[in-house]
Amino acid sequence: MISSNDFRTGTSIELDGSVWRVVEFLHVKPGKGSAFVRTKLKNAQTGSVVEKTFRAGETVPQAILDKRTMQHTYKEGEQFVFMDMETYEEVRLTEAQIGDRVKYLMEEMEVNVLFWNSQVIDVELPNTVVLEVTETDPGVKGDTATGGTKPAIVSTGAQVNVPLFISIGERIKIDTRTDTYLGRE
């Protein structure tokens, strides 16, 4: 059991026979009445997002997830194949199951795959990845008056805003959680 006061982004709970992940949470203490926690929950099986309010201190069952380190080995048709690094078992996931993080997924990348009742719930990528810039506009000397960013396409096809001095062929570090440029590699 977990208290609603302990909710954090990414916390997994069980409600109505399903696993829900906390996407957003806000502790509210109104001037009159008791405190409560307003949350946005994402259903791990269906992907639907709902808003739910809990009383402060209310306890709910915490989902016990099995986290396994797996390697993305290859893509076959519409499925991404992951191999367990210890047992060599393969798990196949669709792009819909992985979500928008698929844009940073590379072959031989190690990821954490979360299971609940032998069912894949989520895929956690590393917080940062290093990718090569494949397309971007050339930077013009002295063109930094507007804040200095331009769009760039990296080797996996993802689009990221980068500083003007970045050119094609450079390797850059990207935060996969916020889709932001962190620096050159």
Swiss-Prot record:
This is Elongation factor P. It is found in: Cytoplasm. One of its GO terms (biological process) is peptide biosynthetic process. GO terms for cellular component: cytoplasm. It comes from the Bacteria. Pfam families: EFP, EFP_N, Elong-fact-P_C. Involved in peptide bond synthesis. Stimulates efficient translation and peptide-bond synthesis on native or reconstituted 70S ribosomes in vitro. Probably functions indirectly by altering the affinity of the ribosome for aminoacyl-tRNA, thus increasing their reactivity as acceptors for peptidyl transferase.
